[in-house]
Amino acid sequence: MSFLIDSSIMVTSQILFFGFGWLFFMRQLFKDYEVRQYVVQVIFSVTFAFSCTMFELIIFEILGVLNSSSRYFHWKMNLCVILLILVFMVPFYIGYFIVSNIQLLHKQRLLFSCLLWLTFMYFFWKLGDPFPILSPKHGILSIEQLISRVGVIGVTLMALLSGFGAVNCPYTYMSYFLRNVTDTDILALERRLLQTMDMIISKKKRMAVARRTMFQRGEVQNKPSGLWGMLKSVTASAPGSENLTLIQQEVDALEELSRQLFLETADLYATKERIEYSKTFKGKYFNFLGYFFSIYCVWKIFMATINIVLDRVGKTDPVTRGIEITVNYLGIQFDVKFWSQHISFILVGIIIVSSIRGLLITLTKFFYAISSSKSSNVIVLLLAQIMGMYFVSSVLLIRMSMPPEYRTIITQVLGELQFNFYHRWFDVIFLVSALSSILFLYLAHKQAPEKHMAP
């Protein structure tokens, strides 16, 4: 009876997660597109629902909600379903919609979709060869074979995003990095933009007049054909007429310049708004957060370097370790185990909420940046794939943030994976991503003022 009650709780929560994923799909991702494939919408929503359910089970584990056997059953079932979606269903439909957009392969799209999926499976399976991610006793068809490979991709993605975010967050929030933009700078750039637009209009008028003159003279109808005619039209022009090819090249160059000037003008306006915003109370608050995240970024890079050099992985969760150090330093009586469990629960909850919120914001920006009416289905499926792998990998890494007594069921469900490898791999990719982001933002920040001061 208790199993049925526990299952009804899990099914109800999954329906709610599915509904939230469905609404997010309709109101955020596809609100500007009329053509919707319901299979894509269902796959995205199901992936979101089972991804959130894994985090829900972590919280239930800490709070002791549901029977332990029920939690184990739903852990196992949830993991099997999410792996089935990520390894079999989503890759197949990505291939299917790619082939469907190619007219030559439209009649045999099912065959070519299967070929693309088999190609994916080959490279997906070969991915595990260079990494020490499995225990030797696991068979080729075990669930550990799938989750270990999904974990490598997901942890790599998480580390890349975390490394860039750790650097970009203080760069975005801190007023120290803001360029000093004045109204004079904006007016000067707008004047250059207007001058460029006037030149474009003037040259297009010249082209229109030249074409009308050529038409009146009959040069358009009697234009010679063949290679010699093309060369003559490019290199020569009739007396009193314009060389249209050269003018068109000048117009193209000016239009490209106008686009760049427009983007630079918009960037200056955005920077000026940030300067005004930084003077408000909320702006000062985020500026303080920027300094905090700067310290966190330096500490994280330092710890990642130490972990890589010393080849170490923490055995104690950060909360318990931090409380132990503080208590020993102050020499006070304190129930470390009791409070570490409660603080760990709050920390894990914050990590989960931040992960879901941050990923959804990133997915929305990414979708609007690269999607079109034809590619949108493929992009949504790719986002679903990334989302599922991201959340599975989060479970692998969040395990270390939990006290040892709560890690047991995750270890049992995920199998005898080489958890230490994933933490070391995360440190390596995080360090590379953070240092690359620092270099990129440094160069961008250094070149930006020079670009705006250019004549």
From Swiss-Prot:
Keywords: Glycoprotein, Golgi apparatus, Ion channel, Ion transport, Membrane, Protein transport, Transmembrane, Transmembrane helix, Transport, Voltage-gated channel. Disruption phenotype: Delayed transport of newly synthesized protein from the Golgi to the plasma membrane, impaired glycosylation of proteins along the exocytic pathway, and structural disorganization of the Golgi apparatus. Defects are associated with decreased acidification of the cisternae of the Golgi and trans-Golgi network by 0.4-0.5 pH units with no effect on lysosomal pH and no effect on endocytosis or recycling. This is Golgi pH regulator. The chain crosses the membrane at residues 5-25, 46-66, 79-99, 114-134, 150-170, 290-310, 343-363, 378-398, 425-445. One of its GO terms (biological process) is protein transport. It comes from Cricetulus griseus (Chinese hamster). Homotrimer. Interacts with RABL3; the interaction stabilizes GPR89B. It is found in: Golgi apparatus membrane. The keyword DNA-binding does not apply. One of its GO terms (molecular function) is voltage-gated monoatomic anion channel activity. InterPro entries: ABA_GPCR_dom, Golgi_pH-regulator_cons_dom, GPHR/GTG. Glycans are attached at N180, N243. It comes from the Eukaryota.
